[in-house]
């Protein structure tokens, strides 16, 4: 019987700095599915990365993965590069579906991002796998608590979101298998099994 491989990662001052940076950058943001402070999301993604065997560098990138996309584009990315280095800034760039404002249409952004991830760093793939598992878990919880009206908070609606999840699973699992992808596949099946929203064919809400 083989020994269980334990993650030997330790978190130092740079990780603490990333937490403070993310808290400042996302201070005014809330999660669309729960209203929780947005920092809860990046902390959850970082936790999944570390539990998956990720390095401190990957955990820092997880904490920062939405900073440029949501809060300042290239300007914030340059700040991340200055504070945390080129490698982490590249991971954050590859985790972003756009760095421009106003953002392009939802479907176009997602298609673009899928293309970017085909040649992304291995570290980016781990962060994105953790991000998708976290998002799918929260979506499942929202569907349990609020039912089909949950989809009103998503720009892609039910069909668009499931399309995106399936495409992400196909791409990410091809690059890297393991628990996160098994969990993502399970969550997609669970989400698909929830009843259709009566308003699913209507124009989606723009809050997503």
Residue ranges of predicted features:
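Active-site helical microenvironments for divalent-metal-assisted chemistry
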Residues: 2-208
């Amino acid at each position: 019987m083989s020994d269980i491989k334990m993650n030997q990662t330790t978190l130092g001052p740079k990780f603490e700095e990333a937490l403070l940076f993310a808290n400042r950058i996302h201070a005014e943001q809330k999660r669309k599915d729960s209203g929780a402070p947005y920092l809860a999301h990046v902390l959850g993604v970082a936790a999944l990365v570390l539990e998956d065997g990720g390095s401190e560098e990957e955990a820092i990138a997880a904490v920062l993965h939405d900073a440029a996309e949501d809060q300042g584009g290239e300007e914030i990315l340059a700040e991340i590069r200055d504070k945390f280095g080129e490698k982490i800034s590249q991971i954050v760039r590859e985790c972003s579906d756009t760095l421009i404002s106003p953002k392009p249409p939802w479907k176009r952004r997602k298609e673009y991002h899928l293309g970017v991830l085909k040649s992304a760093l291995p570290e980016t793939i781990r962060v994105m796998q953790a991000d998708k598992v976290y998002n799918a878990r929260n979506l499942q919880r929202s569907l349990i608590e609020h039912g089909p009206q949950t989809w009103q908070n998503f720009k892609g609606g039910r069909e668009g979101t499931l399309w995106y999840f399936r495409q992400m699973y196909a791409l990410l699992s091809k690059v890297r298998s393991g628990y996160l992808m098994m969990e993502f596949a399970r969550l997609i099946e669970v989400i698909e099994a929830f009843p259709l929203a009566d308003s699913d064919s209507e124009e989606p809400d723009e809050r997503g």
